A protein has these predicted regions:
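Alpha-helical transmembrane segments of multi-pass membrane proteins
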Residues: 1-330
Length: 330
């Protein structure tokens, strides 16, 4: 069968491209939140660069590796999608649990510096590698489209756009770990649907395709179970050694948001501590409405703007109330 002639498939190429691009955007945005929580917020830009590098590397593989150029398009979509699903799961498990202290990297020449630089390299590799399959699929489909490239490229952009629209609502509702598993599930489903029908394949490949189909179905079912069951089925993300890493019974509530992961930790009754992405956020102090108990704010730096004004303003705008402390100070 010619590489340019597609075997009969269960899913049209435009739909496969739309779905994998949607999953790719969910994966990328999900990892920006995971890495921001695990490491520090500025490593978010590293995720974006590594994702683009992975997609571009997929295109280089297509250009340089002859077996891919000889393979049927649907087979490439199927195998790369299934491989992508497995690589996403494996990558997440490694990234979530690996121990690292990026601050120690700056102690140049020490064992801690080399050890943590190596750990950062592992994280970078697994983020990068999860996007290679997407790059191979996109490069193969668009590179062979000829006169139909406009329609397929539109599907590519539409899928990416839908992924952008869904990323924040899904992160808020499900959390980034499950969003990453949703991306893996989409890849797995596309892989299963893209496998060519046995009727149009040589007999020697029918058994191989059935094995691939069976393994892919197991992966898809496992991922579906994780997505339905929720984040508790996945290992906890181990944060930087320098972060608070509030876990266990001391955590009273945890919630992922579009900006921070917020944990409410027990700071000794009756106070609570807000933890933003594993770093100190602000304290939560009880207040019963009696302003006579707020004398501590008279020497608090947060009262300086009001001391400068002298007379209390009729209206004021507070940006970032820090657990209500600025409100009480006002």
């Amino acid at each position: 069968m010619s590489a340019q002639r597609s075997a009969a498939a269960r899913v049209p190429q435009w739909l496969a491209l739309l779905l994998v691009c949607l999953a790719g955007l969910l994966l990328e945005v999900g990892y920006t939140r995971i890495v921001s929580y695990k490491l520090w917020y500025y490593y978010t830009y590293l995720v974006i660069g590594l994702s683009l590098l992975g997609i571009g590397s997929g295109g280089i593989i297509v250009a340089m590796w002859a077996p891919i150029r000889r393979a049927a398009t649907e087979r490439i979509i199927a195998l790369c999608s299934l491989w992508g699903a497995v690589s996403i799961v494996a990558g997440y498990l490694v990234i979530a649990r690996i121990q690292i202290d990026t601050v120690a990297i700056w102690d140049y020449g020490t064992q801690a510096s080399f050890t943590n630089l190596f750990a950062l390299g592992i994280i970078c590799f697994f983020v990068f590698s999860t996007f290679i399959a997407l790059g191979i699929i996109v490069s193969t489909v668009l590179g062979r489209a000829r006169e139909g490239v406009g329609r397929l490229y539109f599907a590519d952009l539409l899928g990416a756009g839908i992924g952008c629209l869904l990323a924040i609502p899904l992160i808020t509702r499900l959390g980034p770990p499950i969003v990453i598993m949703v991306a893996a599930l989409i890849f797995a489903v596309v892989g299963l649907l893209a496998l060519p029908r046995p009727a149009v394949e040589p007999k020697r490949s029918v058994t191989r395709d059935r094995v691939i189909l069976g393994l892919g179905a197991v992966v898809a079912l496992a991922l579906a179970g994780v997505v339905v069951a929720g984040e508790d089925t996945l290992p906890n993300i181990r944060t930087e050694n320098g972060k608070l890493n509030a876990t266990g019974s001391e955590v009273l509530h945890s919630e992922w948001g579009p900006v921070f992961r917020v944990d409410v930790a027990d700071a000794g009754l009756p106070n609570r501590l807000l933890v933003h992405d594993g770093t100190f956020g602000s304290g939560l102090w009880p207040f019963d409405g009696d302003t006579s108990k707020l004398s501590r704010f008279e020497t608090d730096p947060r009262s300086i703007p009001f001391s400068v004004l002298g007379d209390p303003p009729e209206r004021e705008l507070i940006i970032g109330s820090a657990g209500g402390q600025e409100i009480l100070a006002s």
